[in-house]
Amino acid sequence: MQNIGAPHFHPRRLLAAVLILELVSSLAGCASLGLRPGETAQTEAEESAKGLAYYHFLEAQQCLLEDDFAGAIREYEEVLKEDPNSARLELELAALYQRQGDIKKALAHVEKSLKLDPKQQEAYFLLAGLHVGLNQLEEAIQEYEQVLALDPDNREARLFLATLYAQQRRFPKAIQTIQSILRLEPDSVVGHYYLGRFFIETDQIEEAKQELQRTLTLDFNFVPAMFDLAVAFEREKQYNRALVMYHRVLRHQPNNTRAWANIGRVLLIQNHYGDAQRAFARVKSLEKGDPAAGFNIGIINLEQKLPDDAIREFRPLLSNPRYQERARYYIALALEEKGDLKAATREYQLVSRNSEQFIPARLRMAFLLYQQKEKDRARQVMDEMQKLAPNREEVYLTSSYFYEEENLWDQAINVLKEGMGKVENPEEIYFRLAVIYEKKQDRDESIAYIKKVLELEPDNPDAQNFLGYTYAEQGINLDEAERLIRAALKAKPNSGFIIDSLGWVYFKKGQYEKAVVELERAYHLMPQDGTVAEHLADTYLRLKRLPEALRLYRRATELENSNPTELRKKINELEFRLRGHSL
């Protein structure tokens, strides 16, 4: 939220003129009085003092013309000695002290000014601004309310009030206040703009778009409204419209780094890595090595499998306290990408315990230790993590993974069940338990745990597919299996796994023509998966397409997720049949 605060209170020539009038009036005060004979000496002394005050006042004005504010303060203080009850002089001094950064003296003078004359709107504005500078927002709000008590239609005070409410996250109050401005001035550009901003803050994106578009109708070149309208489009994932609006900002402000940075972010979301990198490079050049831009360029390099380039971007950020830990974490990821597991492990170990990256860094470190055959160290790290982060599901999932890799199903199950009662959202743990029980050939327990996932997340497509495929494998509840898998396919229409499951349900139902359509589609999406290839080969076999079946069985033996023993048996049987056909 942009803090516009109160207007900076500059010395004004109008105020100077008023002060001159006051001073001249006081100097001429005794001209019309009849003086008694004994009062002549006293009167001459007073006249001399007032003449001196007038001299200091003129000197103060000269200092202001020369922007010598410290000199003006000295001269005004001299004037104040002769005219201590001038509310306007106190106000002028308060403004000068504010300009010089002496908030304590500014407060003292403005408060004295208001004590002398409590109806000065300018003084309340200045006092409110001082309170904002001290982050005393409630006090500032009270001062603006005083302005409105004197002038209920004061739009400036209402606008500042609205921005203060927004700073306090009191957005309903901020919105009401801005709407009161628009009732007074329906075509207020600033009013519609801030209303749009506050709607964005409260996730009322449609209303925000309407207000910001209204702002641009009233002032086609109002750049802040363009920028925030782009943000609104981005929030709604209307990325192309957001890009159009950000580029419109750049037509007015070619070096607007926020617009370039947001363009880079949107392009990154759209996987347009080259264009995103160029946008962030522009930010980096404009901001003279902007760390955020360098960080984002590093991320893009990682996404593009350019680990050395990524490391070059991240290394300078190790000296930046804001980015240090994140940079170290991503340097470790880049080293992993390079295959330098030992160096990556060292970087993960250096991530500070107080950083957000500590837990993911430790989990990656344990995983790399396990890959490097340092299994005891890996488990030691995970034991430490279960004590440090007992509520994090990823800790238990990683620990169980190590046991799964060694087919130690019971140990994996025990770890997950320990975490099941500690994490807030155990869906992932339930899902993993279902998978492990499936591997353990305990399908009843597997089904029980996947149903727990669906109780918590009825529309979870992976859980729907898992249960549907499990039913299909067992040849039970095939209509329910088809319903579950079709529901999953709506959420993930291009998932090869789910398409394979649907084809396998058709196969189990004996609907081979329908099965082959889905399984060929799945195989096209996942040509390296042995299970999909085997399912398609089984279907070809049922359709008497024997040469195609044999070719695909042989191909499946070379793929991942295959059962070579079972495949060899099928190949031998089919080869025998084909030899018989050729006799």
Model-derived regions, located:
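N-terminal leader/linker segments that initiate helical-solenoid repeat arrays
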Residues: 30-92, 99-104, 108, 115, ...
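Terminal, low-structured helical/coil segments at or just beyond the last alpha-helical repeat
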Residues: 38, 476, 547-583
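Helix-start (N-cap) detector for alpha-helical repeat units in TPR-like alpha-solenoids
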Residues: 46, 53, 87-88, 121-122, ...
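Structural marker of alpha-solenoid helical repeat scaffolds
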Residues: 48, 82, 116, 150, ...
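Position-specific recognition of the canonical hydrophobic site in helix A of tetratricopeptide repeat
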Residues: 64, 91, 98, 125, ...
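Structural signature of tandem alpha-helical TPR/SEL1-like repeats
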Residues: 66-77, 99-112, 132-146, 167-180, ...
